[in-house]
Amino acid sequence: MNRRIAPPQPFARVDSTETATALARGSAWAFWIWAAVGLMQAGLVWFLGAPEQAEFRGATTGFAVVFSGVAAVLGLVQWRRPNRILPVFGLAWALYELSAMSVSLMVGASPAAPGLPVWSVGVAGAGMVLCLLLHIGGLRGATGMARFTSANRA
């Protein structure tokens, strides 16, 4: 398979600068996936939200759009200048989202806004798991980049 189109494998060996860079940029893809899921949820809240929640629709949608914009910008920053800080932040954010979703499922509450289809929760959960894996790979890649950079300086 052509390495240029191969997806990043978060648990692959980091044995070269190219592999480390590809893994670190995988974290940027995770932020962009996160932004896409956030925009999907914003659209669903706006168009399919429960009528009794209409007064909160604008704020909820705006909040989701702002967070999607933040995630897209973080992805751009991680793509241009891969570092270790953003994958750690992404890991923490993904773990928080997954734990909040898990707790709401355990207590029997709806993990999504009222009136949204059940499949949207599945898409968001799958997206968060994918983001978590890509951020793990991003952290490993950024650490490898730092290691290779310090080895080249010495």
Across the structure, where does each feature detected by a protein language model lie?
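Topology signature of small-to-medium multi-pass alpha-helical membrane proteins
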Residues: 2-154
